[in-house]
Structures are given as structure tokens and as C-alpha cells.
Amino acid sequence: MDKDNERILLANVIGECIKSLQLDKNINQKELALLSGVSERSLRRIESGQVNVNVYVLRQLVLAVGKEMPDFWRIVEKNMELMGEEFPHVRKRVADKVLRDNKK
């Protein structure tokens, strides 16, 4: 996998993990935005994998859902390994984005 595809995949998996932790905490996007200090618009873009999140913002989100960064990275790593089984829609989204980018 080349670096661009890996970056797209990672952004999508991070977004899915944030969304999953948000749902596990039983809070909505607005509540997570308030708890973390991240705008709702930015949160939507992060959760959908549209942007590469910076470490400071990611840390704010992770702490807001009651996790520590090492725990979060373990979750991300596990999901990267299992993505094909657990996140087929992410795999499709990544494939679609790669196809679109290759047409440009």
C-alpha cells in the first residue's frame, strides 16, 4: 500500500474509532464537541475520515471519551488489522477515494 492510500486508510480508521468510542460513551457529536473543545464541523470531518487530525485535537477527543492515547492507539492498530472484517464500509470508502484520486 502506498503512503497516500495508507494515510487515507488511517484517517478513516481513526474517524471510525472516535465515532465508536463516542457511541460507547453514549454521547452525541454535539456533546463530544463540547467536551473536547472541537467544533462539530471538525468532528464530523474527522469521524468521516475527510481530514487528517492533528495530535492535539485527537488527544482532546480521546480524553473527552475517557480514554488515554496509548489505549486509543491500540484500538486503532487492532482496527487497522481487522478493518476488512469489521469496517467493510471504510474499505469501500477508501477504495472509492483512491479511484477518484487516480482519475484526477
What is the predicted role of each segment?
Residues 1-24:
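A short, Lys/Arg-rich alpha-helix, primarily the initiator
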Residues 16-33, 60, 88-89, 93-96:
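Short basic helix-loop element that most often maps to the first helix and adjoining turn
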Residues 21, 35, 46, 75:
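Residues in the recognition helix of alpha-helical DNA-binding motifs
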Residues 31, 42, 52, 71:
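Residues in the helix-turn-helix
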Residues 36-51:
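Recognition helix of helix-turn-helix/homeodomain-like DNA-binding domains
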Residues 54-71:
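DNA major-groove recognition helix of helix-turn-helix/homeodomain DNA-binding modules
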Residues 73-104:
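Short, charged recognition helix plus adjacent turn
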